[in-house]
Amino acid sequence: MTRSLRRDLYAACAAALLVTAAVLVGRHIQDTRHTLFVHWPPLFADWDPHLGPGTPAALAVAAAVVAYGPAVAARLPWRGLLAAAWASALAWIVSLALVDGWRRGIAGRLTTRNEYLRVIGRFHDIPAALRDFTHHIVSGTPDPWPAHIAGHPPAATLTFVLLDRIGLRGGGWAGMWCITVGATGCVAVLIALRALAGEALARRAAPFLVLAPAAVWQGASADGYFAAVAAWSLALLALAVTRRSHGCAAASGLLFGLTCYLSYGLTLFALIGAAVVVLARGGLRERPALVLSLLAGLAVFPVVFTLAGFDWWHAYHLLVTRYYQGVGGTRPYGYWVWANLACTAVITGPATAAGLRRTTTALLPGSGPRRLPETALALLVTAALLALLIADLSGMSKAETERIWLPFALWLLPACALLPRPRPWLAAQAVLALLLNHLLLTGW
């Protein structure tokens, strides 16, 4: 065993110890103080060993990706790889969701009391609903919004309102929308990686993006949909600055503007966007007008929502009040500030822990000869990690971060491209995801 491999294993073991500590300390706090408001800390889940109709498919997808994923990713034509990655990610997410059954795993996820579909009827007049949106954020106001609606800007809810308007009504359609769009997130990351760090590393990352344990929570979670929108904004930004494309710049700005109106916390994606610009700054030097196209696209959604009567900043301040009115004001910051990182270790898996060790090595001076592709990938991953840490320190995400931080987790997974001999690491990722899905009943 080489020294480098031993260090990779140490990193994976450190992540496992962090998760173990979060479980043991969390159980003690919950049993003695009852302040965590989760049944299986640090995850928002219940212990419920079970099998389901998705079990055979999940095992088959996992076995296929572990056995053939690296070789197929290396040989397929680029566009074929993108299509295969999306199809495989979709199959993995759906099969894991169906372990819980169609109703419990997909169709019922977005219809519970705190979810978006419960308020569709209150948006029969969309302009009026937007003008009145901030009046129902704080608890104690007339007809306060359920937690997820109050906790997000209105574009999140409007997505499902518009699906309903075009005839795609109910939890089944909403769940499959989130899964289908969410599965494209890995494609966006691959496109960005190829533009910034080269095709070889993108191909090595592909199986890990497909077989991520995060898929357990991507199944019918709106945050999986948010993650994909944010990822495409970065992919288009990478194409804009490397290809000097005004169209891609405008589209990137448009999607980042939408991202900010899907989730307040995803404004932190600006940090990852800054890393993209730094890595391809030559494109902006040659065509500084790309900034104007980016800003023009970025302005669209803020202008539309502001003119419609929704004040983003005012809504965010009201959300902070609402957050501390509820369990967010009771959950102990001293536990969650590190237990949230344990949740991230769970959804990204042991391979990512080992990969993050290698990204650190790639950035440290004096750690060996610099390779530009590896350094570019490491900078991108580090920017995502920094954004996640800022979100953690803010205290606005205490618990449920295995779902809430899916958008950031998606950009940590490329670190796995730096690992040699990918199959054992892929197997570890798959086993973790299968155990999580079959031993726990996850919720949000």
Task: Give the location of each predicted region.
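Hydrophobic, aromatic-rich transmembrane alpha-helices
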Residues: 64-69, 345-374, 387-392, 414-415
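Specific aromatic-rich, kink-prone transmembrane helix
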Residues: 188, 226-244, 248, 411, ...
